[in-house]
């Protein structure tokens, strides 16, 4: 079967899946979030490349934000004021890596509707860029350290030691903290918090964690964690979505499911909902077509999908839903602003 045939089948199955009548609870959730802004996410286009797409939070009004068949686009993030957009642009032949995506290709800055896109630096430069709260700077992460860069000029303003941080850096909404994945604290793949002024670090959660992001209050984080001791998946277990206070004093399950790894947790701007992806494959499977996304109310958590006998024994009070099923994608980002939909999807190659 050719790649085009596979993609055609994929789009048909996705469409058929969305056409299934949802339960009344899921239908109410969909109606509740339908008008709450837009979600940007990367996904395979019908041409086989990765483009950026927009959709309403209920999955409706899906449209292309970029149409660049000679490139792949990944890792989009709206600025906190929703006026700007950052993403990585890769060569069409380069597979998106679930672990290296923040340092692949070149960084692109654009208006939130995709217009006036401009390449910042060369390939591999400005890795793991994350917007400052005011959109005037972004923080980057490399072997040289955590650097704070002027968003207009590209000038490095200051640099802090990276303290074991190595990927998935995100600046807090209040500007005081950074969260990221660190090989520190006596183990690997920890979630850690860094003081953005002093560079001091502390662990939020340790061992087999990834894809951290902030709640709007900057006091809590959402992240993926594979708790040790699981017997399923041949003893390897499954990655689950958790939340914790940023000081690392408490944590709780948000969503999990035996049979799918849950990644890319992103909390809505009002702190009431969370987006995520669920994939049988590790890292959300960006090498192929990503994975189905989901949306739930945080107040409904914890939720456990499917039979998941082992998980339900550990979390007897967990619910089974509702979870709104969304199209396949990867690393989504949500804004309540209407700005992203102001332009039609005619984005062309970014300028240098």
What is the meaning of each model-derived region?
Residues 10-19:
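Hydrophobic h-region of N-terminal signal peptides that target proteins for export
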Residues 20-352:
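Sequence signature of WD/YWTD-type beta-propeller architectures
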